[in-house]
């Protein structure tokens, strides 16, 4: 009986040990599975965070680019505004001076039509001449320049040819007579000089 009792006890011990081993393996397996789940979740979370970080970095780069473009646009607007203001200052007198040019032309015609040597008209000539010189020097202070090209080579940017005549005194394509002087304001042509050009 002791053999049978021993065997029965041994079987019971084996069953208990196997049960415990199964429990331990199950717990171990459950612990490992739980650990694996946590690790998988952590890896998934890391991937999500890396993706969010990458999206945030892309957004930051995009916004940096937008800020740079906006700053460049502001600089361009400032530059254009400064140029516009400068042009406005430079050429604000253009319309006014254009209205004064006929007055100056009339003074020059009066000088051409008056005999400077005759006693009766000498005083008038000198008065008109002084007035014309004073007038020209005043408007020159504001950037007006006369274009008086007598003897110069014809320049279509500054001169308007009224006609061409043969001339032994002037080489070909030279201004031989100025019908009406031209004017520039701050290097911008207001009116071309009306000229007669030699054919040579």
From Swiss-Prot:
Region (Disordered): 1-29
GO CC, any one term: cytosol
Domain of life: Bacteria
UniProt biased composition (Polar residues): 1-11
Protein's UniProt keywords contain Calcium: no
Key words, A-Z: Chaperone, Cytoplasm, Stress response
GO molecular function terms attached to this record: adenyl-nucleotide exchange factor activity; protein homodimerization activity; protein-folding chaperone binding; unfolded protein binding
Keyword Chaperone: yes
Subcellular location field: Cytoplasm
Subunit structure: Homodimer.
Protein family membership: Belongs to the GrpE family.
Role description: Participates actively in the response to hyperosmotic and heat shock by preventing the aggregation of stress-denatured proteins, in association with DnaK and GrpE. It is the nucleotide exchange factor for DnaK and may function as a thermosensor. Unfolded proteins bind initially to DnaJ; upon interaction with the DnaJ-bound protein, DnaK hydrolyzes its bound ATP, resulting in the formation of a stable complex. GrpE releases ADP from DnaK; ATP binding to DnaK triggers the release of the substrate protein, thus completing the reaction cycle.
PANTHER family: GRPE PROTEIN, GRPE PROTEIN HOMOLOG, MITOCHONDRIAL
Protein name in the entry: Protein GrpE
Organism (species): Shewanella halifaxensis (strain HAW-EB4)
């Amino acid at each position: 009986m002791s053999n049978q009792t021993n065997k029965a006890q041994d079987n019971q011990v084996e069953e208990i040990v196997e049960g415990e081993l199964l429990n331990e393996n199950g717990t171990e397996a459950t612990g490992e599975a739980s650990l694996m789940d946590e690790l998988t979740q952590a890896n998934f979370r890391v991937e999500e965070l890396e993706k969010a970080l990458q999206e945030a970095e892309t957004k930051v780069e995009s916004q940096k680019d937008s800020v740079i473009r906006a700053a460049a646009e502001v600089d361009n607007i400032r530059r254009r505004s400064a140029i516009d203001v400068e042009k406005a200052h430079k050429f604000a007198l253009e319309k006014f001076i254009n209205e004064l040019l006929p007055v100056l032309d009339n003074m020059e015609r009066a000088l051409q039509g008056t005999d400077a040597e005759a006693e009766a008209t000498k005083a008038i000539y000198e008065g008109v001449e002084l007035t014309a010189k004073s007038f020209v020097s005043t408007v020159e202070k504001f950037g007006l320049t006369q274009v008086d090209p007598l003897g110069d080579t014809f320049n279509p940017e500054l001169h308007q040819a009224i006609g061409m005549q043969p001339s032994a005194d002037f080489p070909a394509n030279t201004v031989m007579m100025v019908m009406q002087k031209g004017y520039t304001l701050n290097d911008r042509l207001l009116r071309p000089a009306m000229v007669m050009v030699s054919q040579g």
